[in-house]
């Protein structure tokens, strides 16, 4: 904006109604509209609200107009959106966001594909009604070297899964999750889903990850897992176009398909057999659900109904499954390959990461008139991992092959020719780039720093994993307004 234009904007005024959904910072109900200069920006508006509230210690505020965060002057906003200054503008204010600052990084010997957290607020602990004292949280990582590792918050490895000859994975791990504080599930390129018993010494400095159950059924790589411990169920997404449905209990699971067992593979080929000195029970799937026509990238349980599942695929589709009958209920077809999936139940939306660098928010309900309810843009490479904000119903974190994680507030949107579009609130880069003195922009498409997995935990924060062979932890609390 030129100096003369800024001067004119400062002289123009607009009537605004300031509101907040947070009761402790709301203005009295009888506070009517007030006239303010259209040249004001966030800082000046924040000062104004603090003065109206009579705060001795100023609170930094952010401002939303029609659901979008104000990032310009009011005058520029009015001009960009074709709104007359004669209009009474309703402006909502919330506490200012806290940047997701880097807390720690844990280094591995190989790429890290997957991360999960065990904390007092994590699903695994909540399902088991288990308490995890502050500071005793654990981070689980799955790596391309074929090993699972459990870490404490001091970046020490508490336990490592056994080698292939001792009952471990025989190829790279792509997915790993805590089922409970003493149970872990993992899967990967060896086509198996494996359950492990996790235990720690009394002092918490050492532990064991012991093979408990091997599940066979998929014929190609397994790309992701979802767990619902209360029903003892697991979902898997595989490159064989199938969605696997499994039991965590040996007694509930059917026999493993003979033709997929390692013994059959060693008989039918001349390749070296990895003889395991550990005899682990082997079982098969409750169901393998067909329908996708390309590799399945993700499968999840409905957050409110564990008898419903969703899956995404390279075939561009999102599919809904009835897990009671293992049948396909609905198919939503998009324009791009879908690579990641997360449920936002309060908004009846599913977030799907795409190969086209954006996130599509889809309403899976049959009554939904349009497939894409919203599009989130900002990544410069494929979006391969998604997780909900545990602090806010509106928040989402994404991990991308562009080497960043982006935080989204689905209230921060605008409408353009392509419909409702959102931009990220924050972008988290890899700390490893900073240490090398390089910027993310110098890595074409995220080369060397691709993010493969992300988890957002209320106690620990934003935990991401990637091609830089690191787990990275960033602050996750207060990043978005919780209203």
Swiss-Prot record:
SMART domains: WD40. Its main location: nucleus. One of its GO terms (biological process) is protein-RNA complex remodeling. The keyword ATP-binding does not apply. GO terms for molecular function: ribonucleoprotein complex binding. Belongs to the WD repeat WDR12/YTM1 family. This is Ribosome biogenesis protein ytm1. It comes from Aspergillus terreus (strain NIH 2624 / FGSC A1156).
